[in-house]
Amino acid sequence: MYKRQTQSTTAAVWTYYWQVPSNISSGTTLNVTATATDTNNLPYSGNASLTLTISPTFYLASNGVTVKCSGCSAGDTGMVSGTLYTAVENGTGTNGIKTLVNAGNYNLVTTLVTDMSDTFRDATSFNQNINSWDTSNVTNMLRMFMNASAFNGNIGSWDTSNVTNMGAMFSSATVFNQDIGSWDTSNVTNMESMFRSAQAFDQDIS
């Protein structure tokens, strides 16, 4: 992220840029010292105390599918490819993932979410497109689609590298039969009953 500042003296106008690390959050105060010499060999040195205001950024990930946000808070919104997305957090609060899902809003950016357990449990008519969800920070998918008997959405692009619990994830998801063979399950410690009574599922997950 680059920031720009202009300063002037009686001799010249100085414009300089600096790069702000990605882990710097909005509201951070930085002390900046700039030293320069212009084309006429006129020196300049100055100090400034700056408070950053960083707007959230919604963007399409490099895989061309996942929608992510940087610097966002739950409830922030942003446009990506002509679609308005809302950033959500865990749980059932005002901007919780379960609250918005229950309201029928599936254009969600889930970068802040770590727990997706029971999100679509018993949602027997649910079959919406959620392939763009960012699951890179999710650790818990316990019973996520349990009894979601209509769901057969393409979620093969999900990043599951941090998930530890997939217990009963597709239990009784009777029509689900999508390719999830590329999922990274290296950190999963619980897969108990993951596909129990998932009658249609016959994908290669070896």
Annotate each PLM feature:
Residues 8-19:
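Aromatic sugar-binding surface patches on proteins
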